[in-house]
Regions:
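…primarily DNA-binding HTH/wHTH and HhH modules…
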Residues: 45-68
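Terminal helix-turn-helix DNA-binding modules in bacterial transcription factors
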Residues: 1-38, 60-68
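Key DNA-contact positions within bacterial/archaeal DNA-binding proteins
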Residues: 41
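Short glycine-/small-residue-rich flexible loop motifs, especially phosphate/cofactor-binding loops
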Residues: 29, 44-45
């Protein structure tokens, strides 16, 4: 069975958010809005469900992995 269109769009938004999160200077709320979420809270909930961590924790781990 395939992926529902809504789930596909969420996956694409989160993938784009991960790219943007690699830019440490961009606020999480700006990223949430730029990838199509109406609020940072909803973005964080969906991000954690799909990525396993909150956006802030994911960013910290990703950036630490690049430099550590």
């Amino acid at each position: 069975m395939g992926v529902r269109p809504h789930d596909y769009l969420l996956q694409r938004r989160i993938a784009r958010a991960k790219v943007l999160l690699m830019r440490a200077e961009t606020a999480v709320v700006e990223i949430a809005l730029s990838v199509g979420f109406q609020s940072q809270a909803h973005f964080s909930t969906v991000f954690k469900r799909l990525a396993g961590d909150s956006p802030s924790i994911w960013r910290r781990r990703a950036l630490d992995g690049m430099h550590g």
